[in-house]
A protein has these predicted regions:
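ACP-dependent fatty acid/polyketide chain-elongation machinery
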Residues: 1-149, 347-358
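Active-site-proximal gating segment of KS-fold condensing enzymes and close homologs
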Residues: 151-157, 202-258, 298-318
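Condensing-enzyme catalytic core mediating Claisen C-C bond formation in acyl metabolism
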Residues: 59, 318-358
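Short acidic, glycine/serine/threonine-rich loops at helix termini
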Residues: 70-73, 215-219, 271-272, 296-304, ...
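Acyl-CoA/ACP chain-elongation machinery
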Residues: 282-331
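Stable alpha-helical structural segments in soluble proteins, enriched in small hydrophobic residues
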Residues: 159-171, 270
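Short mixed-charge
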Residues: 173-197
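Short conserved active-site loop signatures built around small residues
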Residues: 267
C-alpha cells in the first residue's frame, strides 16, 4: 500500500507502508506478496493533481435568506435583523410541548464528569420549549408561482424556490418570458426562464435534510381521521424532495443538477460542490438553494422529540440560558427553520453584468 499526499515533494507520497507481520487473508503465505515480490508500485508523480481545468476566481454574486421570528420569512429587513443581532427564537406552543411529552421519551443526559445516563421525560419542564419558527410565506402571492406548481412541492422545497428566485434577482440575473408558437402562428407566454445564453451554463444544487416528511405526516393523519379521505395524486412529487429538479425546470436551467443531505453541513458542502463544477468546466454558474422547516407544528413534534431523546436538544425555557453556542454552559441545540439562496459563478460572468460580488 502507498499513502498519497498533496505535493510532489511529500515523502508520504513516495514511501511504502510496511506490510503486516502476518497475512490478513485466508490465503497461504506464498500467495501474499512481500515487499520484494510485490508488483504494485505508484506511477511516477502519483500525487494529488490540484490543477483545475478552469482556473480563475469564483465568487458569490447573489444571495438571499429567509429567517424565522419575522412577520414574513423573506421580508425586506431580514438582513438588517441579522446584522443587528435581534433574537428570533420564540416559545413553542403548549400543545407541542405536551405532544413531545406524550412520546414517552427516554433522554440521554451527560453529567459534568462525563458520565451519561438515560432519564425518562415525565415533566413538561423537561420538554422542548424554544425554537426558531417561520412567519408568513406564500410562494404564489410573493413570487408569482402558479398554485399548480406550489401544490406539488413540500414546504421545504417551496422555501428553497423562494430563496433561489430572490438570489437570482440579487445577482441581477433576469427571468425572461418563454413563448410557445400556436398553430396559427401566435406566440403564447408559457412561463419565465433564464435567458437562452445562460440556460446550458447554469447548474442547481439543493441542500436540505427533512424534505417531504411534513407531507407524509399530514397525509397519514388525514387518512386516519377523515372518513372521506381521498389520496392526493401529487403525493410522490411532494415527498421525494425534488426541489432542485422542479426549480431547474421552472427557470430553464439545463446544467448539472443534484440534491445533497449531510445534515447541518449541507449548504456548506453544496458550495464546495459548486466550486468543483465550475473548476471542472461542468458549468459557469451554480444556484445553491437550501431550506428546512422542522419547527412547524407537524414536524416539531417528532424532530424535536428526536433531538431531545439523543440529548442534543435543549429543554431550557429561558433563551438567555439556552442560546449559548461554544459556551461551557450550553445545554443543547435550539431547532430552527429557514432558507438560503446563493449564486456561485466565475468572476468574469458577474463582472460582465456589472455586479460587485460579496
Amino acid at each position: 500500500e502507498y499513502v498519497l499526499a498533496r505535493g510532489e515533494g511529500s515523502p508520504a507520497a513516495q514511501t511504502p507502508v510496511e506490510p503486516p507481520a502476518t497475512p490478513v487473508s485466508a490465503k497461504s503465505e506464498a500467495s501474499v506478496p512481500g515487499p520484494e515480490t510485490s508488483t504494485f508500485a505508484p506511477a511516477e508523480g502519483d500525487v494529488l493533481d490540484t490543477t483545475w481545468a478552469v482556473p480563475g476566481e469564483i465568487v458569490c454574486s447573489g444571495m438571499s435568506v429567509g429567517i424565522p421570528g419575522q412577520e414574513m420569512v423573506f421580508g425586506d429587513d431580514v438582513h438588517q435583523a441579522i446584522f443587528d443581532g435581534k433574537n428570533h427564537i420564540d416559545r413553542v406552543v403548549d400543545e407541542t410541548v405536551q405532544a413531545i411529552l406524550n412520546k414517552n421519551i427516554t433522554r440521554l443526559e451527560k453529567g459534568p464528569d462525563g458520565t451519561a445516563q438515560y432519564v425518562p421525560i415525565k415533566d413538561p419542564a423537561q420538554s422542548v420549549h424554544l425554537a426558531g419558527q417561520l412567519g408568513s410565506f406564500d410562494l404564489c402571492e410573493e413570487f408569482g408561482i402558479e398554485e399548480r406548481l406550489r401544490d406539488g412541492l413540500d414546504r421545504a422545497s417551496q422555501l428553497a424556490f423562494g430563496a433561489g428566485l430572490d438570489a437570482l434577482r440579487n445577482a441581477r440575473i433576469p427571468l425572461v418570458p418563454r413563448y410557445r408558437t400556436t398553430r396559427s402562428g401566435k406566440k403564447v407566454t408559457t412561463g419565465w426562464a433564464l435567458p437562452d445564453s445562460m440556460r446550458d451554463e447554469t447548474g442547481i444544487i439543493y441542500a436540505a435534510c427533512f424534505t417531504g416528511i411534513d407531507v407524509a405526516m399530514k397525509q397519514a393523519r388525514a387518512a386516519a381521521t377523515d372518513p372521506n379521505y381521498t389520496f392526493d395524486p401529487r403525493f410522490l412529487l411532494q415527498v421525494i424532495g425534488m426541489g432542485h429538479a422542479r426549480f431547474a425546470e421552472f427557470i430553464g436551467a439545463r446544467g448539472p443538477n443534484t440534491r445533497i443531505n449531510v445534515a447541518c453541513a449541507s449548504t456548506t458542502q453544496a458550495i464546495g460542490i459548486a466550486e468543483d463544477w465550475l473548476r471542472l468546466g461542468r458549468c459557469k454558474r451554480v444556484v445553491v438553494i437550501g431550506s428546512d422547516d422542522v419547527t412547524e407544528a407537524d414536524m416539531m413534534e417528532w424532530v424535536g422529540s428526536g433531538f431531545l431523546a439523543t440529548g442534543a436538544g435543549t429543554n431550557e425555557s429561558d433563551v438567555t440560558k439556552a442560546a449559548l453556542p461554544f459556551d461551557k454552559r450550553r445545554n443543547g441545540t435550539i431547532l430552527g427553520a429557514g432558507a438560503v439562496g446563493l449564486v456561485i459563478e466565475n468572476a468574469e460572468k458577474a463582472e460582465n453584468r456589472g455586479v460587485v460580488p460579496y
